[in-house]
């Protein structure tokens, strides 16, 4: 796959390349060749996005970690210069209450503290038997059904959806509804009208659920938020926004990682064998870290804006300029990882990947995602050792048009 590292980047008449960029059909797991060409030249550069603005694209591993940790960088998407993902996201920015995803400083700390309880290492470890049971039940159903089977529909999507539904206290029968509304705003060309409609529907649903949990609490995360509302620490709107974010992040990203990860393993059977034969949990854990590094499913950058001048990588990011922190080229940075374009599940230092971000804004649910991936990959390969792709790789429908990369379908046989 090393030929993907030197391809030219698309440029506008001004010489500033457009972003996002297209991936290579010949190597769908690699970051876009144009992005890798920019990264090979320098760790940050200007790019042009959908609205004509030219934020900084950060591709170097060290620079990514540095900016993730820099208090002069803001996640506040209301600030001028913030490089929004699409018109839909921009259109809803002043309609959404603040949340852990868009707050800085003490406000961010307050929100994160309110979300931390269900995602502690202890709570996640206690969930492992439940995740294992859900995984086994869906593999049982897949084995009992016809071939080929769509692994996305049969396993990759329902497992994390069920897990996050149970964790949050959201009825699973509503999963199709929240998946639909969540997906609307994640599309590259989502319109303002579509995004507003989806966001309002999800927010209304979560607000009503928070109010219901205030009257009848249970052992779940939405009930925890409801208790915060009753204590005067959160408004119902804030609690609903936090719950909405967890609901979207808790199933969409993990589902994509399961589907794309299984595909990567199927086209690298020697590496699949490492997971299939693994008895040591440490080997399984490291394999997941390497898959996270190799695939980096948040494919079009974590969005930020500078509120002070920042000198980094030989450039100066001025206050008010947008920043896009691209995880994929950072995780393929040859200065940080030897042979980065190679999937190697025994890789030393794989845990240094930035797939979940870095610093104070790194993913609050990362321990849950790791547990799900460890269980699903190993169980699937051990229970169905003859699992194979039922179509040509070039015929697999990839999510090139989404914020989170993955596959729409994954036909498999055994």
Curated annotation (Swiss-Prot):
Q: Which organism is it from?
A: Mycobacterium marinum (strain ATCC BAA-535 / M)
Q: Which residues bind heme?
A: 108, 302, 304, 361, 363
Q: Does the keyword Zinc-finger apply?
A: no
State the residue spans of region: Disordered. Answer: 1-21
**Enzyme nomenclature, EC number:** 1.14.-.-
Gene that encodes the chain: cyp105Q4
List the residue ranges forming a coiled coil, or say none.
none
Segments of skewed composition (Polar residues) = 1-12
Q: Which coenzymes or cofactors are required?
A: heme
This chain's protein is named Cytochrome P450 CYP105Q4
InterPro entries registered for this protein in UniProt: Cyt_P450, Cyt_P450_B, Cyt_P450_CS, Cyt_P450_sf
């Amino acid at each position: 796959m090393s030929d993907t590292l030197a391809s030219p980047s698309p440029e506008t008449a001004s010489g500033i390349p457009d972003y996002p960029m297209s991936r290579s059909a010949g190597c769908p797991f690699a970051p876009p060749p144009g992005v890798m060409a920019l990264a090979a030249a320098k760790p940050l550069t200007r790019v042009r996005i959908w609205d004509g603005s030219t934020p900084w694209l950060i591709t170097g591993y060290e620079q990514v970690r540095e900016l993730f940790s820099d208090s002069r960088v803001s996640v506040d998407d209301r600030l001028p210069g913030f490089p929004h993902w699409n018109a839909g996201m921009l259109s809803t920015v002043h309609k959404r209450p603040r949340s852990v995803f868009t707050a800085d400083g003490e406000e961010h700390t307050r929100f994160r503290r309110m979300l931390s309880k269900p995602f502690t290492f202890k709570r996640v470890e206690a969930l492992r038997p439940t995740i294992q049971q859900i995984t086994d039940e869906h593999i049982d159903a897949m084995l009992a059904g016809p071939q080929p089977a769509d692994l996305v529909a049969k396993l990759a999507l329902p497992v994390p959806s069920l897990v996050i539904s149970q964790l949050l206290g959201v009825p699973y029968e509503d999963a199709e509804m929240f998946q639909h509304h969540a997906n609307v705003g994640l599309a590259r060309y989502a319109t303002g009208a579509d995004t507003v409609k989806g966001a309002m529907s999800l927010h209304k649903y979560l607000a009503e659920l928070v109010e219901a949990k205030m009257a009848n609490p249970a052992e779940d995360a939405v009930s925890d938020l409801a208790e915060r509302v009753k204590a005067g620490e959160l408004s119902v709107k804030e609690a609903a926004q936090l719950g909405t974010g967890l609901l979207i992040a808790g199933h969409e990203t993990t589902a994509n990682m399961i589907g794309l990860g299984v595909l990567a393993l199927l086209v690298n059977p020697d590496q699949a064998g490492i997971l299939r034969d693994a008895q040591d949990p440490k080997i399984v854990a490291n394999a997941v870290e390497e898959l996270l590094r190799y695939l980096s499913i948040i494919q079009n950058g974590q969005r930020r804006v500078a509120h002070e001048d920042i000198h980094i990588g030989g450039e100066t990011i001025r206050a008010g300029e947008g920043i896009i922190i691209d995880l994929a080229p950072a995780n393929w940075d040859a200065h940080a990882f030897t042979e980065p374009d190679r999937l190697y599940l025994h890789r030393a230092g794989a845990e240094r990947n930035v797939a979940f971000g870095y610093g104070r804004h790194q993913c609050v649910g990362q321990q849950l995602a790791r547990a799900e991936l460890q269980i699903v990959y190993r169980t699937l390969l051990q229970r169905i050792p003859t699992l194979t792709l039922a179509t040509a790789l070039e015929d697999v429908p990839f999510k090139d048009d989404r914020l989170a990369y993955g596959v729409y379908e994954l036909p498999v046989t055994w």
